[in-house]
């Protein structure tokens, strides 16, 4: 199964497509996501962003949880760690970590804007870029995780090197 996000005029759509090209299911996201994408947790949960929210959708297309925000998260693909926690950064550069149940674990302002997606090394360290007053910064943040999720696609580009090679 391939999971993809399709941008729309007012909302994005998270789609599951079978190997033969037929649609398995689709889930309408709570807002547009022109540069977002989907990632997969170790248990098969699919995570995506849309508008001012991040959602967790089960492998059969049912909503597991939705985390609503006060600011847009349209330019980031989430990341899921080995605990099932979801990491992302908003367009206004607020870095969030949610538990596997969709509850806030932590957040931190890293600047004024971001067009990046977090990447996690095999040691659980998260790297993320943000901007502040025309200056760009890359942050390395300890997360308490011991690595990214053992799944087919835990982050943008599939792995820390962004090779897009599915295992």
Where are these regions (language model features)?
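Extracytoplasmic/lumenal domain signature
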Residues: 1-167
């Amino acid at each position: 199964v391939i999971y993809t996000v399709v941008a729309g005029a007012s909302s994005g759509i998270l789609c599951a497509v079978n190997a033969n090209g037929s649609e398995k299911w689709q889930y309408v996201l709570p807002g547009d996501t022109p540069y977002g994408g989907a990632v997969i947790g170790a248990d098969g949960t699919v995570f995506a962003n849309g508008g001012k929210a991040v959602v967790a959708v089960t492998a059969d297309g049912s909503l597991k949880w939705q985390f609503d925000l006060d600011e847009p998260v349209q330019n980031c693909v989430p990341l899921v760690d080995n605990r099932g926690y979801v990491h992302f950064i908003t367009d206004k550069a607020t870095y969030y970590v949610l538990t596997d149940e969709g509850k806030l674990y932590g957040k931190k302002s890293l600047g004024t804007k971001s067009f990046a997606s977090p990447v996690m090394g095999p040691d659980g360290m998260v790297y993320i870029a943000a901007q502040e007053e025309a200056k760009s910064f890359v942050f390395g943040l300890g997360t308490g995780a011991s690595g990214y999720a053992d799944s087919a696609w835990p982050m943008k580009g599939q792995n820390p090197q962004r090779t897009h090679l599915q295992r």
